[in-house]
Amino acid sequence: MRVEDFDFELPEELIAQTPLVDRTASRLMVVTPGSNEVEHQHFAHVLEELRTGDCLVLNDTRVLPARLMGVKEETGAHIEVLLLKQLPGTDEWETLVKPAKRVKVGTVITFGDGLLTATCTGELDHGGRTFEFHYDGIFFEILEQLGEMPLPPYIREKLEDKDRYQTVYAKERGSAAAPTAGLHFTEELLEQVKAKGVEVVFITLHVGLGTFRPVSVDSIENHEMHAEFYSVTEEAADTINRVKRNGGKIIAVGTTSTRTLETIGSKYDGEVRAEQGWTSIFIYPGYTFTVVDGLITNFHLPKSTLVMLVSTLATRETILSAYQQAVEEKYRFFSFGDAMFIRPKE
């Protein structure tokens, strides 16, 4: 299939620059796979779509305030360092650096008046560098103090409250971007979901910057995804499998939860097992879902791998029709935007 098959017109003013004050006040478009009829609701309506005996699966990753602004010790030049991945058991990180040409192996960068320093230990592709960090105390506490949220490139407004780019259940540190479908949930709404007899399960996938990487090939079959770390506990796997056995539907919150479940389910004939690892699964039309029945997701970029994923669950024609209606009705798009509920097939 061609990348162009997933293109649509999107006026720039529909890209949400700031989050709404009330997380559940976002609009919700309800989509039935194979149909061009949609329902326009508000997000709290998701409670009506979930049924007793279903299972809601959420990604509990926590976004790191991974953008650090520092100065080159030697010259005082300003350097931006974006943390991507910690090398296991070390104080070394893979990073993206701007401007990369000013940073060579051995370069020392200082952050926060010396609260944190970093020495470049290696050069990677595309402006990447490895750094070893030096500090007194706990690294992640210093990062919370000095770091900024790595907002997507299409958001140009400064985020006043870091917590608005975290889900209310964010727990496991490690993401370079938020699992944005989960931003709509409040603790109160999750309690109402549980009270209805819906199982609420948490899994983890650390979202990488590859989530914003454009598809640069003409044929989608030739696109390669960046690998991202995932983890599913035995308790989570057991609950999901029990719900499926009992005829309940598995509703994934976000494309990250979807990709995690399908990574595992596609290996074990639809069974979810406790495991952790790295996934580069790319879901596009032609793929058969093994675990996920329904999906809560935001509105995504034209020609993105995320539009391809939702088109696989709901059909391409249904999604492109829904997106056209979303533009006409002035829905808010992307990370801080509105949501879509793709109903399970009956």
Curated annotation (Swiss-Prot):
Protein keywords: Cytoplasm, Queuosine biosynthesis, S-adenosyl-L-methionine, Transferase
Compartment(s) of residence: Cytoplasm
Q: What GO biological process term is on the record, naming one? A: queuosine biosynthetic process
GO cellular component terms, semicolon-separated: cytoplasm
- Stated EC number for the protein is 2.4.99.17
Q: What GO molecular functions are on record for this protein?
A: S-adenosylmethionine:tRNA ribosyltransferase-isomerase activity
| Catalytic activity, as annotated | 7-aminomethyl-7-carbaguanosine(34) in tRNA + S-adenosyl-L-methionine = epoxyqueuosine(34) in tRNA + adenine + L-methionine + 2 H(+)
Q: In which pathway does it act?
A: tRNA modification; tRNA-queuosine biosynthesis
What broad class describes the main subcellular location of this protein?
cytoplasm
Asked if the Swiss-Prot or TrEMBL record annotates the protein with the keyword Cytoplasm, the reply is yes
Root EC class: transferase
Cited Pfam families: Queuosine_synth
- Protein's job: Transfers and isomerizes the ribose moiety from AdoMet to the 7-aminomethyl group of 7-deazaguanine (preQ1-tRNA) to give epoxyqueuosine (oQ-tRNA).
The similarity annotation says: Belongs to the QueA family.
How it assembles, according to the record, is:
Monomer.
What PANTHER family does its record include? Answer: S-ADENOSYLMETHIONINE:TRNA RIBOSYLTRANSFERASE-ISOMERASE
Instruction: Please give the name of this protein.
Output: S-adenosylmethionine:tRNA ribosyltransferase-isomerase
**What species is given as this protein's source?**
Lysinibacillus sphaericus (strain C3-41)
